[in-house]
């Protein structure tokens, strides 16, 4: 389901914010039920590049949808499964967009600069609200230093 959603986003087809939210939640519910939970039940460790915090940042802060609604839908979609650690590589919005490059984007990549600023504020607010489960790093540090700091934190968890 996630792959189909990615194709839809890359198609450039206009989508209402609430439709976008519901599609992400449906894809997440399926992923958690079919892949993540069974893997965790077998003792596995899951590393994901997007989860509920991304939905809150993009749909809540970026698109302006009701954050309480997003929290409720996230809880339903995940069965309350939360990450032990969320890493936020904090970069100025302009730097992050420049790093993305000029290749083909999706509905998010092609959004106005203010949209990306709202998302950045969202991630910052989420990290500040739960500092024990977030690791905020300067995304302009050398990659080796970023890796070192992430690994040091991960080792305290696994």
What are these regions (language model features)?
Residues 1-78:
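ATP-dependent small-molecule kinase phosphotransfer cores
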Residues 3, 90-91, 117:
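Alpha-helix N-cap/helix-start motif at coil-to-helix transitions, marked by capping-box chemistry
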Residues 43-44, 83, 131-134:
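A generic structural signal for alpha->beta connector loops
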Residues 48-50, 79-100:
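Conserved phosphate-donor/acceptor-positioning beta-strand/loop module used by diverse small-molecule
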Residues 72, 88, 136-138:
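Structural signal for conserved beta-strand scaffold positions within catalytic alpha/beta enzyme cores
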Residues 78-80, 128-129:
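Arginine/glycine-rich "motif VI" loop of SF2 helicases in the C-terminal RecA-like domain
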Residues 94-158:
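NTP-dependent small-molecule kinase module
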């Amino acid at each position: 389901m996630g792959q189909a959603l990615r194709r839809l986003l890359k198609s450039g087809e206009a989508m209402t914010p609430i439709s976008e939210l519901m599609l992400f939640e449906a894809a997440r519910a399926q992923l958690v039920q079919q892949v993540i939970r069974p893997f965790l039940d077998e003792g596995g460790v899951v590393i994901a590049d997007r989860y509920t915090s991304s939905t809150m940042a993009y749909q809540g802060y970026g698109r302006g949808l009701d954050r309480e609604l997003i929290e409720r839908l996230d809880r339903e979609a995940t069965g309350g499964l939360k990450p032990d650690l969320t890493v936020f590589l904090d970069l100025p919005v302009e730097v992050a967009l420049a790093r993305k490059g000029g290749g083909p984007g999706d509905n998010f990549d092609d959004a106005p600069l203010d949209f990306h600023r709202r998302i950045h504020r969202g991630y910052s607010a989420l990290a500040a609200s739960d500092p024990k489960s977030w690791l905020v790093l300067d995304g302009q540090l050398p990659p080796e230093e970023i890796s070192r700091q992430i690994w040091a934190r991960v080792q305290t968890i696994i």
